[in-house]
């Protein structure tokens, strides 16, 4: 089931939290490295949970991870790890928190080599889902196939974030996602 159809199957109170994400963020290209990092962290934290849970905790994640500033997160020490493990506003999973910190360090290295995380993504585009998954598994932590697929669809590197009949699809095309550029 597509995300477009999924939202319409939800109860009205759940639809509201998804509607904003669907209409304004999902599938649109992201040009800022910190926001790309944000999306990666949210997708990693969704593993095994509902996307509704993650969307409801989104602002808590933003606060807990210093607005997803890559340099700050990469510099987290044991006290920061403990702070995150005690923060009821986020997902308190050791592997996911560790992945956020280690992936921030990895992105800093990518930024040194490619100038930005986005440039690294653009450098490797286009790839199939399987090729992307292999690359992400070699580069990052806690990035299985579904996490990589959702991260890349949600940021415009893979198609099918929206059905062609969805009104948002035309807005996505105007935003020129990577998958639509030849």
Predicted segment positions?
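HhH-family (HhH-GPD) DNA N-glycosylase catalytic core used in base-excision repair
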Residues: 1-182
């Amino acid at each position: 089931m597509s995300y477009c159809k999924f939202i319409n199957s939800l109860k009205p109170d759940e639809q509201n939290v998804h509607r904003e994400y669907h209409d304004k963020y999902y599938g649109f290209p992201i040009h800022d490295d910190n926001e790309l990092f944000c999306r990666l962290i949210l997708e990693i934290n969704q593993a095994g949970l509902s996307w509704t849970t993650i969307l409801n905790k989104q602002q808590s994640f933003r606060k807990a991870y210093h607005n997803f500033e890559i340099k700050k997160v990469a510099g987290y020490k044991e006290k920061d790890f403990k702070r995150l493990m005690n923060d009821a506003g986020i997902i308190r999973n050791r592997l996911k928190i560790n992945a956020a910190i280690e992936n921030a360090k990895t992105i800093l290295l990518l930024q040194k080599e490619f100038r930005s995380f986005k440039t690294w993504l653009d450098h490797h585009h286009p790839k199939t889902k399987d090729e992307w998954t292999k690359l992400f598994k070699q580069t990052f932590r806690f990035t299985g196939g579904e996490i990589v697929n959702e991260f890349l669809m949600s940021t415009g590197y893979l198609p099918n974030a929206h059905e062609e009949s969805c009104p948002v699809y035309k807005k996505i095309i105007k935003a020129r996602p990577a998958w639509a550029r030849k």
